[in-house]
């Protein structure tokens, strides 16, 4: 196995809150997959939930070396937790096609948040 990419991102939670205050659900609709949206709608801390998902997806886009463009969209990266609570990534659409083209076999995700910030790192391996 070889490391194909590494990405990290930090999000100021207050910025996400400000965007939601200004534009309602638009950011959440753009960022979240259908499964994540269902969780977001009933989450006790929806702003924090969205900030963490945004950080992971930005980190993933950086790890893939593409950013969010050329057919890639935030909602093609889905963050979920395995049976032990570890964050994982599931890919859809163009993100999945890109991973297959690059020969991605494993994606490692770490996610942390505290009062003001959410931070994520994604490593992709062949």
From Swiss-Prot:
Check the record and name the Gene3D superfamilies matching this protein. Answer: 4'-phosphopantetheinyl transferase domain (3.90.470.20)
Q: Where does Mg(2+) bind?
A: 9, 58
Which molecular function terms from Gene Ontology are attached?
holo-[acyl-carrier-protein] synthase activity; magnesium ion binding
Reaction(s) catalysed by this chain, per the record, are: apo-[ACP] + CoA = holo-[ACP] + adenosine 3',5'-bisphosphate + H(+)
**Broad class of the protein's primary localization:** cytoplasm
Cellular component GO terms held in the UniProt record? cytoplasm
Q: What is the required cofactor set for this protein?
A: Mg(2+)
Task: Tell me its EC number(s), please.
Answer: 2.7.8.7
Q: Which NCBIfam families match?
A: acpS, pantethn_trn
What family does the database annotate? Belongs to the P-Pant transferase superfamily. AcpS family.
Q: State the HAMAP family in the record.
A: AcpS
Q: Please report the name of this protein according to its UniProt entry.
A: Holo-[acyl-carrier-protein] synthase
This chain's source organism reads Citrobacter koseri (strain ATCC BAA-895 / CDC 4225-83 / SGSC4696)
């Amino acid at each position: 196995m070889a490391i194909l990419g590494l990405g990290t991102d930090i999000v100021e939670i207050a910025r996400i809150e400000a965007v939601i205050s200004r534009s309602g659900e638009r950011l959440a609709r753009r960022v979240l997959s259908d499964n994540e949206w269902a969780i977001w709608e009933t989450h006790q801390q929806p702003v924090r939930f969205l900030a963490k998902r945004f950080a992971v997806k930005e980190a993933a886009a950086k790890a893939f070396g593409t950013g969010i463009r050329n057919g890639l969209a935030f909602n093609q990266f889905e963050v979920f937790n395995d049976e032990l609570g570890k964050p994982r990534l599931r890919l859809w659409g163009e993100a999945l096609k890109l991973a297959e083209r690059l020969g991605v076999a494993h994606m490692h995700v770490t996610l942390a948040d505290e009062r003001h910030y959410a931070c994520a790192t994604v490593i992709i391996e062949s």
